[in-house]
């Protein structure tokens, strides 16, 4: 009899928190990561993102830099008080040297300029998850909890 070894990719999808005040960007990024087998969790602003991280397991955050109330970096600072290892990808329309410096000091995995390239985002998501949690099964058929494996 074959013994099963359970890993995160075998038993559940990674939850990707996508926070952007632009609904179109937020939903498009959600569709991109969902098509790859991840579970998107959408937030329209930083305070909502913090609340989500307080109440459910999140494995990676994709944060818009410029949002009302809290910037992406301010949001990251707050969510890291809850989950100190949470990897983050920052998206921005203005990737200045100063912003890059701030992101580096905040241990952001990567800064992605807008408009975002879906392939680049997916590659960075997989790399950030892999660096934090170990190798990631990139197959879009990752089963959700309770679903049979193919």
Where are these regions (language model features)?
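Two-component/phosphorelay signaling modules centered on CheY-like receiver
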Residues: 23-41
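Acidic catalytic/metal-coordinating carboxylates
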Residues: 44-48, 71-74
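Short amphipathic alpha-helix used as the core "switch/output" element in two-component signaling
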Residues: 51, 73-85
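Active-site beta3 strand of CheY-like receiver
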Residues: 56-62
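Receiver (REC) domain active-site loop signature in two-component systems and cognate sites
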Residues: 67
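Alpha4 helix (beta4-alpha4-beta5 surface) of REC/receiver domains from two-component response regulators
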Residues: 74, 95-111
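C-terminal output helix
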Residues: 98, 116-126
């Amino acid at each position: 009899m074959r013994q099963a070894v359970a890993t995160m990719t075998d038993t559940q999808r990674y939850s990707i928190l996508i926070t952007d005040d632009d609904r179109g960007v937020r939903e498009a990024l959600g569709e991109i990561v969902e098509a790859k087998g991840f579970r998107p969790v959408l937030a329209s602003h930083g305070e909502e993102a913090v609340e989500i991280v307080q109440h459910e397991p999140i494995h990676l955050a994709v944060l818009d830099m410029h949002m009302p109330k809290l910037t992406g970096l301010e949001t990251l600072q707050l969510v890291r008080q809850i989950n100190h290892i949470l990897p983050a990808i920052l998206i921005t329309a203005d990737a200045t040297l100063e912003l890059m410096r701030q992101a580096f000091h905040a241990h952001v995995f990567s800064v992605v300029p807008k408009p975002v390239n879906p392939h680049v985002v997916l590659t960075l998501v997989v790399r950030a998850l892999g660096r934090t949690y170990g190798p990631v099964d990139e197959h879009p058929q990752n089963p959700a909890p309770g679903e049979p494996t193919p």
